[in-house]
């Protein structure tokens, strides 16, 4: 397995797909990285030379914010919104949808299982 930005890249996948296993790199950024590193996107990771992996690793480290740094930045952005008390920060704090979605129904993913109705239970029969 090739290791880029602290992530083990799967050996059997094409490099254009495998590079997206790095948090912060999607399909378009991945293709851009491969173009800059002069690597054919159709090649499998196991077929890459150590030099090609090194070029990809260098480009990712130099030009992109990925993995831990990106996660930390996102968390700090959310914390900043909560600290200044803006509407988006309040929604984050309450665990509600942030981007204007309806909440009378739906929003289950964000809100979790709150106050679900409990079904009627049958009384146990005597034997």
From Swiss-Prot:
GO molecular function: rRNA binding; structural constituent of ribosome; tRNA binding
GO CC, one annotated term: small ribosomal subunit
GO biological process terms held by the UniProt record: translation
Pfam families listed in its UniProt record: Ribosomal_S13 (PF00416)
SUPFAM superfamilies, sorted: S13-like H2TH domain
UniProt KW keywords: Ribonucleoprotein, Ribosomal protein, RNA-binding, rRNA-binding, tRNA-binding
Region ranges (Disordered): 93-127
Top-level lineage group: Bacteria
Function, in words: Located at the top of the head of the 30S subunit, it contacts several helices of the 16S rRNA. In the 70S ribosome it contacts the 23S rRNA (bridge B1a) and protein L5 of the 50S subunit (bridge B1b), connecting the 2 subunits; these bridges are implicated in subunit movement. Contacts the tRNAs in the A and P-sites.
Assembly and oligomerization: Part of the 30S ribosomal subunit. Forms a loose heterodimer with protein S19. Forms two bridges to the 50S subunit in the 70S ribosome.
Protein family: Belongs to the universal ribosomal protein uS13 family.
Name of this chain's protein: Small ribosomal subunit protein uS13
Higher taxonomy: Bacteria, Bacillati, Chloroflexota, Chloroflexia, Chloroflexales
Gene name as annotated: rpsM
